[in-house]
Amino acid sequence: MSDSNKFKLAGVMGMPIYQSRSPILHNYWLAKYGIKGAYGHFPVELKNLEAAVRGLSALGLAGCNITLPHKVHAMKMMDHIDPLAKRMGAINCIVVQEDGALHGFNNDGYGYIQCVKDAQPDWRADAGPILVLGAGGAARAIVLSLVDEGAKEIRLVNRTISKAQELIAVSYTHLRAHETGRNL
């Protein structure tokens, strides 16, 4: 069977997971472009993450997206990690290679930047302070992508200021942490 005729199975892995709309979106595009495949929810608790990730190849999956709370933990199970994902310290996408090797990527920041550029073609990261809400895995990726785009000042707001300060301490020197709703 040629690769183009092969049924492709993928999904989104996390816990909780059923609130994710990813299967609706991915299955729409699979159908629209006539790609033989399906995309579903994979509810996996942290204690079962390694077994689930290592089982992707054996089950014949093309890969999966990774979401809370697994973005950092799943990195340890990859055979290869994209350089950008290494810098971000988290992955959100696993691709199963033909030889069964697991390749980890992070496209959170790229997706965010592209969305902003699509909505505001004249946008420039260095035009003024940028506000980022949250300090989790996606925020980490977005902040790094903003820095790569030339942002001079990023204001990070999180419910717990210690989490925001933790993100800043990792490597982002031109961030300022703020408690929710204060001195933005």
Task: Cite the ranges covered by each PLM segment.
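Glycine-rich adenosine-cofactor-binding loop
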Residues: 14, 106, 116, 127-147
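Conserved S-adenosyl-L-methionine
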Residues: 148-153
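Phosphate/diphosphate ligand-binding glycine-rich loop within oxidoreductases
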Residues: 2-121
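NAD(P)-binding Rossmann-fold cofactor-contacting core
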Residues: 154-171
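Short, glycine/serine-rich, charged loops/turns that create anion-binding
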Residues: 17, 137, 161
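Single conserved hydrophobic/aromatic residue that forms the stacking wall/gate
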Residues: 174-184
